[in-house]
Swiss-Prot record:
Membrane topology annotation: Multi-pass membrane protein
Keywords: Aspartyl protease, Cell inner membrane, Cell membrane, Hydrolase, Membrane, Protease, Transmembrane, Transmembrane helix
PROSITE patterns according to UniProt: SPASE_II
Listed transmembrane segments: 56-76, 84-104, 132-152
Function field: This protein specifically catalyzes the removal of signal peptides from prolipoproteins.
Source organism of the structure: Chlorobium luteolum (strain DSM 273 / BCRC 81028 / 2530)
Protein name as annotated: Lipoprotein signal peptidase
GO BP annotation list: proteolysis
Enzyme class, first EC level, given as a word: hydrolase
NCBIfam families in alphabetical order: lspA (TIGR00077), PRK14787.1 (NF011368)
Active-site residue list: 113, 139
One Gene Ontology term, aspect cellular component: plasma membrane
Family statement drawn from the similarity comment of this UniProt entry: Belongs to the peptidase A8 family.
Length: 167
């Protein structure tokens, strides 16, 4: 459990620290910082929705949904007997990222985003599109944790003799 807690706290701290830097250097100084021209930059954005800026519910509902998911992850990890590093890492990343974004929603009603990969900007099926959203450290942690759950599913949730005969 210590690994889970430490990783979640690290993600929260890194997320909040980098968002403070983004507010100061990108929003307050009104600039975008190009790292790799036409590919990677730090660009300030505020997101009232969820992934990819989708706004499917009022801010209060999104806050409650985020809280319920984080609480669900915390309860699941606490009740599970699985203490493997990969299990704790995946769920620690997801919980830390969820809490990091939840802090923003509580403080300002929106999430600060600033990491931007310009993979494609142009016309697609007659509409102007930008194919990659601006995101943050918390979003990255959630995505990495979710990918770990998919990629290492059999190691995280081993198929034991008991579970095979339980159904």
């Amino acid at each position: 459990m210590k690994m889970f807690s430490m990783l979640a706290l690290f993600v929260i701290a890194a997320d909040q620290f980098t968002k403070k830097l983004a507010v100061f250097f990108l929003r307050d100084m009104q600039q975008s910082i190009t790292i790799i021209p036409d590919f990677f930059s730090f660009t300030y954005a505020e997101n009232r929705g969820v992934a990819f800026g989708m706004e499917f519910a009022p801010p209060f509902v999104l806050l409650m949904l985020t809280g319920a998911i984080v609480l669900g992850v915390l309860v699941f990890v606490a009740r599970s007997r699985n203490r493997t590093p990969i299990f704790l890492s995946a769920f620690g990343l997801i919980a830390g990222g969820g809490i990091g974004n939840m802090i923003d929603r509580i403080a300002s009603g929106r999430v600060t985003d600033f990491i931007y990969f310009d993979l494609y900007k142009g016309e697609l099926f007659g509409h102007w599109v930008s194919l990659w959203p601006i995101f943050n450290v918390a979003d990255s942690a959630i995505t990495i944790g979710a990918c770990m759950l998919v990629l290492f599913y059999n190691r995280i949730f081993p198929d034991t003799e008991e579970t095979r005969h339980a159904g």
